[in-house]
Every structure is written in structure tokens, then in C-alpha cells.
Amino acid sequence: QWERHWTVNVMAGVRLSRAYLPAMADRGWGRAIFISSESAFNIPAEMIHYGVSKTADVALARGLAKRMAGTGVTVNSVLPGPTLSAGMAAMLKPVQEKTGKPIETVAADFVTKHRPSSIIRRASTVEEVANMVVYIASPLASATTGGALRVDGGVVDSLA
């Protein structure tokens, strides 16, 4: 799984950046957005390979942001925490069927058990993560670059 995660989570970003950043720089405007994970800073013991690849993803974005300095191109990472996506809903479906609880409640129970540092004590919604992406893709975020922007519900216990 190490090689697969490295290829998907890191090398895909390298390849896409090589393909698109030069043209963005030539135009004097662009946005590169990496979807990372709170696992980049909160590496799960059961998924070290995933956490390491997401940490590399954040480092890649930061380095590319420095490389793009002065071009009008920003590069950022978005770090979702537990998110009630279709994938999470599918993973939790057996529990939902067994308990009869709404999927949001099952997801909140999962977050409470597996990510007890969560401040919001529930899974984020896909829309909440998308809102961050929309913002950093917009002209409003022209001074936001090289960032690791968390949409993690406070899961990562850090002041930075």
C-alpha cells in the first residue's frame, strides 16, 4: 500500500503541477489546490502509509508555493478531517443498518470514538470542505499561499 498511496497522493500532484503551473505562471494567475488530510499532522497508527503520503503532499504544496512566488499563482493544501462523504457513509452503513440511527449520528459516534480531539464532535460535511476549496480558488484568497488550511473540526490539537 505504500507505493500506491505515494503514487496517488504525491506523484499525481507532482505530475499535475508540472503540467499546469507553468501556464498559470505565464498567465499571471492561477490556483493549485492539494486535498490533503488532517492525517498529515495526526498520523494514524493504523494508516502510517497514508499519513506519510499526506505529509509529503503538504510539503510539496508548500515548496511549490515558494517556487511560484511573484507569479500570481497560489498553492495551498486543504486538510479535511473526518468528513461524511459517500465513502465514509458506505463504511458506516453496516453500523447504521444495525442500530437504525441516522447516518449523521453514526458518523458523530465514529468521530467521538476514533478522533476524540474533535472540537465539533461530528464529521464535517462535504459542503464544509468544499467551501474552503471555493474560497482559496477565488481571487479573495490572493494573499493565501503555502498554507495548510484545516477543515478538520479541531481534530488536530495544535495552535498553529
Task: Please give the residue ranges for each predicted region.
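Catalytic Tyr-X3-Lys loop
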Residues: Q1-V14, I33, D57, I120
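Active-site helix of classical SDR
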Residues: S17, S53, A61
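Alpha-helical segment proximal to the catalytic Tyr-Lys
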Residues: P22, K66-R67, S142
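Residue(s) in the substrate-gating loop at a strand-loop-helix junction
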Residues: S37
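Short C-terminal tail/terminal secondary-structure segment
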Residues: N42, V133-V134, L140, T145-A160
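Active-site loop-to-helix junction immediately N-terminal to the catalytic Tyr of the SDR YXXXK motif
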Residues: I43-G51, G63
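Short, small/polar-rich loop/turn modules that mediate ligand/substrate recognition or access, typified
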Residues: A69, T74, T144-G146
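A conserved structural motif in NAD(P)-dependent oxidoreductases
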Residues: S117-V129
